[in-house]
C-alpha cells in the first residue's frame, strides 16, 4: 500500500464521490486527511480512499486551482 502523504493521488472508495480521483492536500492525523481535485475539498477518513502509486508535487494546503493544474499536467483529470 502506498503511503498517506501530501501529493499522493488516491481514489475515493466510499461515499457519493466514490470512484473519483483526488489528491491528499493535508494530513490531519492518523485517521483523517484533506482531499481535493476531482472531488469537493473536504476532510476524509483514510479508510475511505485507496492510495495509488502516483504522486504530484504539491505544497501542504495547496489551493484547489493548484491541485487541478497538477492533476491536469500529470494527465489524471
Swiss-Prot record:
InterPro entries: Rib_uL2_dom2, Ribosomal_eL14, Ribosomal_eL14_arc, Ribosomal_eL14_KOW, Translation_prot_SH3-like_sf
GO biological process, one term: translation
Origin: domain of life: Archaea
Molecular function (Gene Ontology), one example: RNA binding
Gene Ontology cellular component list: cytosolic large ribosomal subunit
Matches recorded under SUPFAM superfamilies: Translation proteins SH3-like domain (SSF50104)
Keyword terms, alphabetized: Ribonucleoprotein, Ribosomal protein
Signal peptide range in chain numbering: none
Disulfide cross-links: none
Record-stated family: Belongs to the eukaryotic ribosomal protein eL14 family.
Protein name in the entry: Large ribosomal subunit protein eL14
Organism whose genome encodes this protein: Methanococcus vannielii (strain ATCC 35089 / DSM 1224 / JCM 13029 / OCM 148 / SB)
Amino acid at each position: 500500500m502506498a503511503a498517506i502523504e501530501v501529493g499522493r493521488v488516491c481514489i475515493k472508495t466510499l461515499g457519493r464521490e466514490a470512484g473519483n480521483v483526488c489528491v491528499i492536500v493535508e494530513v490531519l492525523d492518523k485517521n483523517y486527511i484533506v482531499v481535493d481535485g476531482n472531488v469537493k475539498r473536504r476532510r476524509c477518513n483514510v479508510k475511505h480512499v485507496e492510495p495509488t502509486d502516483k504522486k504530484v508535487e504539491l505544497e501542504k494546503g495547496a489551493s484547489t486551482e493548484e491541485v487541478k493544474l497538477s492533476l491536469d499536467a500529470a494527465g489524471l483529470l
